[in-house]
Every structure is written in C-alpha cells, then in structure tokens.
Curated annotation (Swiss-Prot):
GO cellular component, as recorded: cytosolic large ribosomal subunit
Similarity comment: Belongs to the bacterial ribosomal protein bL28 family.
Keywords on record: Ribonucleoprotein, Ribosomal protein
One function term, GO molecular function aspect: structural constituent of ribosome
Protein species of origin: Actinobacillus succinogenes (strain ATCC 55618 / DSM 22257 / CCUG 43843 / 130Z)
The encoding gene: rpmB
UniProt cross-references to InterPro entries, sorted A to Z: Ribosomal_bL28 (IPR026569), Ribosomal_bL28/bL31-like_sf (IPR034704), Ribosomal_bL28_bact-type (IPR001383), Ribosomal_bL28_sf (IPR037147)
HAMAP family: Ribosomal_bL28
Name this polypeptide is given: Large ribosomal subunit protein bL28
Region (Disordered): 1-20
C-alpha cells in the first residue's frame, strides 16, 4: 500500500538527518497517514480512506460528499 493521502495527495518527502557535527545522511519524511472509515449518508454506506490528519480536517470543513466527488473526478476508485 502506497504512503499517499487520498484527499491531499501528500506523499513522502526526502531530506537529510543532521547530526551535531552537521553530517548529512538521507532520510524520508513520511506523511501522518491514518486509515479511517466515514459514513456517507447519501450512499448509505461506509467509505474507508487512507488519509493524513490534514485530510481529515479538510473533510470536516468541506464535507465527505464534496471530498469524495473530488477524489472520483481524479479517477480514483473508492
């Protein structure tokens, strides 16, 4: 399963660990992903999404129906 938020599209970023001596070693910054079930009243069913904490806040703001419409417009199957 890929580490990509289904709402925001956020994916792992790359950067450096920096020690006290400023040695640089490569590392990955992973998104704060959660698997969450949402009740969709219009479809009378649960929908499971893999999303970041920011994606959950977007759903709180816009509503699950609007977010699902955006995801389906991108061609993702839900």
């Amino acid at each position: 399963m890929s580490r990509v938020c289904q709402v925001t599209g956020k994916r792992p970023a790359v950067g450096n660990n920096r020690s006290h001596a400023l040695n640089a070693t490569r590392r990955r910054f992973l998104p704060n992903l959660h698997t969450h079930r949402f009740w969709v009243e219009s479809e009378n069913r649960f929908v499971t999404l893999r999303l970041t904490a920011k994606g959950m806040r977007i759903i709180d703001k816009k509503g699950i129906d609007a977010v699902l419409a955006d995801i389906r417009a991108r061609g993702e199957k839900i």
